[in-house]
C-alpha cells in the first residue's frame, strides 16, 4: 500500500479498525476518512476530479487581437505583456479577444486565471463564450467574470455539451491596462492544482507559485525539485522524485513563456521561501535534512533559494547562474534559441542593455557569495560547450570559498540541449548515491511490465 498508493488519493472507511500501520499510512498519504454515505457521494460527484493527466497552458500575448474601436496607446513588451492606455469608454465594450479557442467537454471544468495590471479607474470583464461542437456560430452558453470575481480563480463548469470556448475582454474607464497571460487548466474543482493536493500561492501582483508535497515515509531527506522551462504548465519530475522513496516537494511556476527563473518581487521570493520552510517544518526536519535539485532553469531556483535554506546538498543538471549572460548570448552565440531570456532580463532589471546584463548577474552572485556553504555538497553535471551560460560550472567553483564545501562535477560534450539524456542519467545516478551514502536509503528500481 505504501508503494502503490499515491498521496491525497487514499480514502478509508471511518469504520475500519484503527491500528498503528493504518494510522501511519493515512498520515503519510494525506489520506481521508469517509462514512459509507460519504463514499457514495464521492463516487457520484468527486471521483471524476481525480483524472490521470493534468493539463495547463496559457494564451501568449501575440494571440491577442485588439478591437478596431480602440484608439489609445498600444505597446508590446516582448512575449510578456500587451499594454494599453487610453479612454476605454463609459460603458463596457470589447477591447481584446484571443484568436485561439479551447475545447471543453461535457462534465469537464476549466480553471481560468488572468494575469493583468490596471489603473484603479479601469474596470474589466472576462467573457467566455461556448459554441456547439462542429458549428461556427451556434451559441451554447456564456460565462462572465467581473473585477471582483477575477480576484480568484474562475471556473468554467460545463454541464452542457462539448464545444469550443472563445475568450474576450471587455473594459470601461480611463487609464492603463496590461494584459499579461490568460491561463487555462483542467480543473479538479478545488481538490488541488494540476495534481490532487497541489498547492497554489499567489502574490498581490497575481503572480503564481505551485508546490506539490508528498510526505513519503516521513523520513529524511526531503527531496525538493524545481521544474525547468516548459510551455505546458504543471509539475516536472514527479516520477523521478517519487521513485526516490522518501518525502518530496515539486516547485513550479508559469510566468513568462515557460518560467521566470523563480525571480520576482520581495513578496514573491519570500512567499516561495516560506512555502518551502513550511513543508520542511511539517515533517519536523531541519535544513540539513533537505536536498535541492533541478535541471536547466530549475537549477537557478535550486541555487537561488539554496542561499536561503542552505540544504544538505544541491544536485544540478545543466546549471544556469548568470542569467544576464544567458540573455546576452541570444544575440551572437544562440540567435533565436531562447528569446524568453530577454523577457526575463527586461522584466527583472527594466532593460536589455549591457548594464542590465551585469545587474542581473550581480543579483545572483551577491546572494551566492554572502552564503556560508560549509555544510553543503554540490553535485553538478554540465555541458562543456553550453551556449546558454558558458561559464556556469567554472564560475560556481571559483565562488565556492567556504571551508568544508564539497563539489562533484561531470562535464559532457555538447551545447545546452544536445544531450539531456546523459545529463539526466548522471543526475539520477548521483542522486541515488547521495541518498545511499548520506541517508542510508536504497532506491528501488520500478518494476517493468
Task: Give names to the regions the model predicted.
Residues 294-306:
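Glycine-rich nucleophile elbow surrounding the catalytic serine of serine-hydrolase chemistry
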Residues 53-195:
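Beta-strand-enriched, solvent-exposed domains that form extended recognition/catalytic surfaces
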